[in-house]
């Protein structure tokens, strides 16, 4: 059987079957049967099948990869990349929102402000973090963090992975749209460098609120859009089952975003996606973060704001 801890996506069935065959052969080898060459041959075949599959993913398949439950999340990146991390809680207006986490720590020895959505990894943690869908208090906490970062002259790092802001009645009553707008404005107004990375899903205003940054990076199989494929399908076709068709038409991939000038850099993922080797993906992300901030060193507050403003103006010109 394939690794019981690994979740295979529907389109990965051929790879799962080969992995299962490898495990069967290894079990036979453990009993004394000499089949080392056969195991190596099947392993090589499985590796090639995986590489071929991921070299030609459709937008809908990338959507499935971006949502993979074993993909590294905010806490994984923070635990690996940030030392002396001190989380902050609450928006000083309503309460705490566990869907959007943030705080201060050190990145490669330098002080930094970090924030982002956390989806959770277990049933209990997913419910606690509301599947990464932040409420107004989450975005107001983000504004609070950014204001503190500017006050202390600290760079800001945003890790984005969310299906969107939470659309519940309570969230709307507490001013969800206003909170998203305030967070977006706070990002744009920062006088310190900010870097945003879309690690999985970057959906709607819930993502935009943290990604109006000097540098926007995106993992190879992440997605970024104003609306989820399912929601677009329901609106355009009045049929939620056409999500695959919607995804294939919406231009949501990292490659699309780079072509449009929406993101600056694509971070290559391990063969088979970030979920197959989270440690390698996190290490590569750390290097990309360091490079992005290095490119912004030496700029004063006015130059930082000008660069960021010009970046987003150019996006509009490219798309017009």
Swiss-Prot record:
It is found in: Cytoplasm. Its EC number is 2.1.3.15. InterPro entries: Acetyl_CoA_COase_a_su, ClpP/crotonase-like_dom_sf, COA_CT_C. SUPFAM superfamilies: ClpP/crotonase (SSF52096). It is an enzyme of class 2 (transferase). Keywords: ATP-binding, Cytoplasm, Fatty acid biosynthesis, Fatty acid metabolism, Lipid biosynthesis, Lipid metabolism, Nucleotide-binding, Transferase. Belongs to the AccA family. This is Acetyl-coenzyme A carboxylase carboxyl transferase subunit alpha.
